Amino acid sequence: ISSAASDVYKRQSYINYCYSLGIIAGRGNGKFDPAATVTGNEAAKMLLVAAGYDAQLEGLTGNDWAIKTASLASTLGIFDDLTAPTGDPLTRDNAALLIYNALDIEMIQKYENGYAIAFEDHRTLLSTKYGVYKVEGVVTGNEWAQLEDTDSEDSLATGKTKMDHVKVYKSTTSNTVVGEYEEEKNPVIFNVSTPVDMLGQTVTMYVRKTTVLANSEVLGVYVNGN
């Protein structure tokens, strides 16, 4: 695979691969400029294309690429919680933030009449590439206590958390609408520790889903709204 850039000798293979997919475009003057920093807009453009957005159709190239990129990325939530100007070079922390947000947007399957069409199953980079899904529910028991039992002896084993009204979202996007989830009929006990102050709270978990939901690897859990 060959790119249009003449200065990618150090890491030529994967830079050229990204060129071939349209994820990167260099400076537009035949140079990739590998030693330069990356701005928020530049990173967002790469992440958008990785999620399936067409750079040409979305206007992410040409003189107005930065404006169009910032607009689309903001709409999709890629810049959520970013306090720095999107045209500034990214810190490592802010780069991680943008990547985290981009993992949570729906992937694009195709374009029809110039409009981006997402997959019917609302897949995201997070679910497609890593098998990670969003789960919501109310914590009703953990190693500290169970809500229906006040005796501490009735608490669950260490490293266990019981959730009721569990919803498994088909998409991990923060903008998922009602109807895009499957609700479990019975409480589910997950293999994860949670603090006592989560009891009675509605929480979100990110899990690497297995056939049996209770056996899924829990990657993170937080109280909704935090």
Predicted regions, residues:
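Phosphate/pyrophosphate-binding loop motifs in nucleotide- or prenyl diphosphate-using proteins
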Residues: 22
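Single conserved hydrophobic/aromatic residue that forms the stacking wall/gate
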Residues: 1-5, 9
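Terminal recognition/anchoring or ligand-binding modules at protein termini
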Residues: 26-42, 49-225
